[in-house]
Structure formats: structure tokens, C-alpha cells
């Protein structure tokens, strides 16, 4: 039996919305129709002015808060942030979580059936970008009669998605919270993504992305990709504090088996992820990260790119995040200030690295709460 805490969303369920209007993508491909899976928390007010959209990161999904009745251990990935009395208070806001187009948790993506062929899309599913997602967010809002989001919020890739909506449809959002994100990937980050992709692409079970029809899954490649990614999400201090050089069995074995606790942890994370995620979706999501660069059409001038934005911004970074360092957030802040937009910025002390945006941290949560409390609905 599930025991609900007073500040918990409680039991939730996912829903699905179908779109028949063709969607033209940035790649020039067209989806004749598609579906998005989503969850909502709280109540949409009569004015439809209290909606908040939460955008997920690379491996995230629509299950942002609460638990499922048939799987109470599957807690939403931002459950510590969203709920009655929490920083994003569902007594005030109507919070929406969407599994992005191209995802593998119910929204149309590589594992979905292509109505034209009767088979899974697989590698034929077109690459999608944050601009494509922004289009789907607007269409989703239209389904609910939401003319303007009170806020759009996201961490990591989710923060990039939030920025994209603020640029592509500035009239559709009043506040934007960009957390542990960047206005573009550095060469180092693109390199990390490519190595992760190569681990999948060179897995013998990948079969050019058509592993579904072969009855296989590139588990080894996906596992390695996740292990690499997980290293970049942590900080050296957090790894040292949690694992150090601790051995699994207390002594060296003088072989190539897993000996150190950090190795065991990475193998566990890789195995768990490979059981839950689709490899084609992983490839697609890393490309969405690589392609995000709003300044590209403005000769690299980020300030010029943000001239379209109208919303107020909250930008947060974490001191130990070396994947999307505070310097990247300060670049965003400068571009916003150059356009005389209202922006609040904080660099939060943390030892957890990039994953800090998911953690329970009093100062971090106080900052989010204070900002959200000041949003009028």
C-alpha cells in the first residue's frame, strides 16, 4: 500500500494526446501525425494562466513527479522539486511533464510504428531539434487552451528546450528557468557525445539501427555510453567522497574484473539504463544537444539571438558542474542583460557536479521557491 506524504503528488498516471496535423521538422522531414505522452500535476485555473511546462534532460521523460500505483518505487525524476508546498507548488501551478518527440517512453519515436510501413521507425525516424520540440509544446498548449505558459523550466537539455521556446514563441511564455544548461555545446561536450554514439553504433547488435527486426538490442554499446555519460555528470569531489579508492572485496585481485567500487557503480548504472532506454533514442537525443546553438544564425552573436526573447529569466548554475560550467550560464545571463531583459542569476555551491540540478539542496530549492512564489497567475 502506498503511503502518501503531505507534500507528495501521490499516485499519478500518464496520458496521451494525438496530433493529426503534419509536423515539419528542421531537418525538412515531415511527420504526418504523432503522439505525445504527458503527466500533469495540480489544477489548471479557469483563466488558464498557471501552467508550467517542465522539460526533461537527455535520459528523462514525462514522469516528473509522483508515483505509479502499480510501481510505487518509480518516483518522478524531480519529485523533490514539485508538489504541494514544494518549490514548484502544485497548489498554485498546473505542472506539465511531456516525453519529448523522439523519446522512448510513449511519445512517437524510433520504437513507434510507422503507419506508412507497418514497422518500427528505427533508424528511419528523423533527427529532431529543440526547435521541433518547441513546435510540439505550442501545439500541446493549444490543446489545453493555454495561450501563454506562466513558466517553462528545465535542467541540462531541458534548459536548452526552455530557451528555445522563449526564442521561437516568445509570446507563449512569461518566465523561463534555465538550470545547469548552456547556450551551445563546447567542443569537449560534442566529443563526449560522439564517443557515446560510437559505442552504440559499433555494437554488433546495433544492425544499423534496425535491431528490432533482428531481435537484438545494442545493450553493450548503450551500457558503455551511459557509463561515459555518468562520469561527466558527477564531480571529482563527489566521486572521491562516495567511492574514493575503495575496493569491492578489500584486496587487489590482479585481473581485469571489476575491483573498485566506482567501477561497480558505473557498471550498475550502465546495466540499469540499458534495460530501460532505447539506443536509437539515445543517439537522437545526443544530436539534439549537439545541434542546439541559437546564435548560429546570428554569426555567433548570442545577444542578437536573444533579442527575440520577451520573458523574465531565472538562470542557475552549480560550482562543481564541469559539463555545463557556470561560465556557460554567465554567457546566457550576459546575452539577456544585453537585451535589457529581467534576469536573476545564482551560482550555487555544490559538490555533485552536473547532477546537482536533480538533488535535494536547501539553498537551491530556496532560490527556485522564491522565484516561483513571485510569479503572478
Curated annotation (Swiss-Prot):
GO terms for cellular component: cytoplasm. It comes from the Bacteria. It is found in: Cytoplasm. Substrate binds at residues 226, 355. This is Homoserine O-succinyltransferase. Residues 50-358 form the AB hydrolase-1 domain. The keyword Amino-acid biosynthesis applies. It catalyses: L-homoserine + succinyl-CoA = O-succinyl-L-homoserine + CoA. The record marks 323 as: Important for acyl-CoA specificity. Belongs to the AB hydrolase superfamily. MetX family. Homodimer. It comes from Nitrosomonas eutropha (strain DSM 101675 / C91 / Nm57). One of its GO terms (biological process) is homoserine metabolic process. Pathway: Amino-acid biosynthesis; L-methionine biosynthesis via de novo pathway; O-succinyl-L-homoserine from L-homoserine: step 1/1. The keyword Cell inner membrane does not apply.
Amino acid at each position: 500500500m502506498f503511503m502518501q506524504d503531505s507534500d507528495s503528488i501521490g499516485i499519478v498516471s500518464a496520458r496521451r494526446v494525438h496530433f493529426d496535423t503534419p509536423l515539419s521538422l528542421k531537418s525538412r522531414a515531415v511527420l504526418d501525425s504523432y503522439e505525445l505522452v504527458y503527466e500533469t500535476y495540480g489544477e489548471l485555473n479557469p483563466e488558464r494562466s498557471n501552467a508550467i511546462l517542465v522539460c526533461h534532460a537527455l535520459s528523462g521523460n514525462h514522469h516528473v513527479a509522483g508515483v505509479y500505483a502499480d510501481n510505487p518505487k518509480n518516483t518522478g525524476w524531480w519529485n523533490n522539486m514539485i508538489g504541494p508546498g514544494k518549490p514548484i507548488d502544485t497548489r498554485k501551478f498546473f505542472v506539465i511533464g511531456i516525453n519529448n518527440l523522439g523519446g522512448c517512453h510513449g511519445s512517437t519515436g524510433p520504437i513507434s510504428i510507422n503507419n506508412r510501413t507497418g514497422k518500427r521507425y528505427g533508424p528511419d525516424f528523423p533527427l529532431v531539434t529543440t526547435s521541433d520540440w518547441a513546435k510540439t509544446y505550442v501545439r500541446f498548449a493549444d490543446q489545453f487552451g493555454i495561450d501563454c505558459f506562466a513558466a517553462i523550466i528545465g535542467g541540462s537539455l531541458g534548459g536548452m528546450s526552455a530557451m528555445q521556446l522563449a526564442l521561437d514563441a516568445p509570446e507563449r511564455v512569461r518566465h523561463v528557468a534555465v538550470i545547469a544548461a548552456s547556450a551551445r555545446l563546447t567542443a569537449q561536450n560534442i566529443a563526449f557525445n560522439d564517443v557515446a554514439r560510437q559505442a552504440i553504433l559499433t555494437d554488433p547488435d546495433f544492425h544499423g539501427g534496425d535491431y528490432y527486426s533482428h531481435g537484438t538490442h545494442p545493450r553493450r554499446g548503450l551500457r558503455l555510453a551511459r557509463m561515459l555519460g555518468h562520469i561527466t555528470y558527477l564531480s571529482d569531489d563527489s566521486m572521491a567522497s562516495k567511492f574514493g579508492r575503495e575496493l569491492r572485496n578489500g584486496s587487489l585481485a590482479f585481473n581485469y574484473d571489476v575491483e573498485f567500487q566506482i567501477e561497480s557503480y558505473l557498471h550498475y548504472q550502465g546495466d540499469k539504463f540499458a534495460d530501460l532506454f532505447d539506443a536509437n533514442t539515445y543517439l537522437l537525443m545526443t544530436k539534439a544537444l549537439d545541434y542546439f546553438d541559437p546564435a548560429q544564425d546570428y554569426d555567433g552573436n548570442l545577444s542578437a539571438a536573444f533579442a527575440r526573447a520577451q520573458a523574465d529569466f531565472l538562470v542557475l548554475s552549480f560550482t562543481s558542474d564541469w559539463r555545463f560550467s557556470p561560465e556557460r550560464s554567465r554567457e546566457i545571463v550576459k546575452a539577456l542583460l544585453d537585451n535589457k531583459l529581467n534576469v536573476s542569476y545564482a551560482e550555487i555551491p555544490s559538490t555533485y557536479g552536473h547532477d546537482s540540478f536533480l538533488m535535494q539542496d536547501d539553498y537551491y530549492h530556496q532560490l527556485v521557491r522564491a522565484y516561483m512564489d513571485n510569479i503572478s497567475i
